[in-house]
Amino acid sequence: MKKVTSLKKRSDNCKIVKRKGCLRIINKLNPKFKQKQG
């Protein structure tokens, strides 16, 4: 999981999700693309 200041989709399968007031990117096909903001 990378912590970043600006989220960017690294592939078309990435989805932006808001959990507990923090934005995340999840990708079920390629889990190494996970990102978190905040």
Curated annotation (Swiss-Prot):
GO terms for molecular function: structural constituent of ribosome. GO terms for biological process: translation. The keyword Transferase does not apply. GO terms for cellular component: ribonucleoprotein complex; ribosome. Keywords: Ribonucleoprotein, Ribosomal protein. The gene is rpmJ. InterPro entries: Ribosomal_bL36, Ribosomal_bL36_sp. It comes from Karelsulcia muelleri (strain GWSS) (Sulcia muelleri). HAMAP family: Ribosomal_bL36. It comes from the Bacteria. This is Large ribosomal subunit protein bL36.
